[in-house]
């Protein structure tokens, strides 16, 4: 499912997987999103270059959002397109500004999950929907615990970062199944 024009085990490979996570939040078939994102990368790889979203003259942030939104729709990635176009621009800008345009650096030190979560999860939107927290290296838009685990496993599986211990990405439906079949039991805030 990787784009033909993507060098394996490269920074661009890591960026592709990082951006793919925007569609892994539920509500869309993972394979479908991957196929459409693959085609988008093969035809317009420049949109996967984080610096495109930071040092653009005469283009506002809203202009960048509108531009990527139109491309996402064109490539049939319209599931949550309003959110994902904003997240795309915000996350690319944060990668440029704080992580040398490279998602692998989020995990270069094989962090424990608490550290990884702190780096990836954080407040990103204000009450009036302005970007906030851009000055901090921590916090990517629409990334929660499941996505922090998922990007870690994506990058480890692709041999883009060294293996380290992190929880598996589990969503609400899997947890509901595990608890209803008494595979795990929850007492208060503790899991047995």
Regions inferred by a protein language model and the residue ranges of each:
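HhH-family (HhH-GPD) DNA N-glycosylase catalytic core used in base-excision repair
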Residues: 1-192
């Amino acid at each position: 499912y990787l784009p033909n024009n993507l060098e394996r085990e490269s920074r661009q490979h890591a960026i592709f997987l990082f951006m793919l996570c925007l569609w892994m939040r539920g509500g869309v078939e993972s394979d479908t999103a991957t196929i459409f994102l693959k085609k988008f990368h093969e035809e317009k790889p420049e949109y996967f270059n984080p610096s495109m979203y930071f040092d653009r003259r005469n283009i506002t942030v809203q202009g960048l959002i509108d531009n990527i939104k139109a491309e996402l729709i064109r490539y049939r990635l319209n599931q949550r397109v309003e959110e994902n176009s904003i997240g795309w621009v915000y996350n690319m800008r944060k990668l440029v500004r704080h992580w040398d345009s490279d998602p692998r650096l989020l995990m270069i030190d094989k962090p424990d999950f608490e550290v990884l979560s702190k780096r990836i999860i954080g407040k990103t939107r204000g009450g009036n929907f302005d970007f906030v927290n851009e000055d901090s290296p921590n916090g990517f838009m629409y990334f929660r615990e499941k996505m922090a685990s998922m990007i870690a496993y994506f990058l480890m599986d692709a041999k883009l970062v060294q293996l380290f211990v992190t929880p598996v990405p589990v969503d609400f439906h899997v947890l509901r199944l595990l608890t209803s079949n008494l595979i795990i039991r929850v007492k208060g805030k503790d899991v047995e």
